[in-house]
Amino acid sequence: TGYENLNNYPTPILFPGTITENLINYYSNKNNFKLGVIQPTSDQIEKEEIKWKKREIKAEVHATSPYTNINNNREWETISKSLKSFDPDLIYLNCMGMKSEHKSFIQKKLNKTVLLATHVTGSVINDLL
C-alpha cells in the first residue's frame, strides 16, 4: 500500500518505492510481462533484479546518474537502445532524482509507458490531501 510499519510512527509515512512497486505488481497482470528499470547507481542493480524476480516479473535493470545533463550523457542513449531491444511493457525510473526530462527522453525513444517515482508518489500524496 505504501505504508510501512505504521505502528512504529506517530504519523503515517509514505514510502515511494513501496507505492510504485505495488502499482507495478498490479499493472503486471499479463503473462510474460517485462519491466525496464533505471536506477541511479550500479550497486543497486542486483538487489533490484532479485526483487522483481521474486515477484515473477522479468526485469532488465540499468543504472545511470540523473544528475548529469541527459543530452551529454551517453549512458542514457545506450540504456534506451538496450531497453528497446528488451521491449518492456513498462519502464520504471526508480530514483527520486529523475525528472520529467528523463521520462520524456525514454518515452520518445521507446514509445512505452514510463513511471517516474516522483510523479507516482506525488499523485498519491495529492489524492490524500
Go through the PLM ranges and name each one:
Residues 1-129:
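Non-catalytic structural scaffold of enzyme domains
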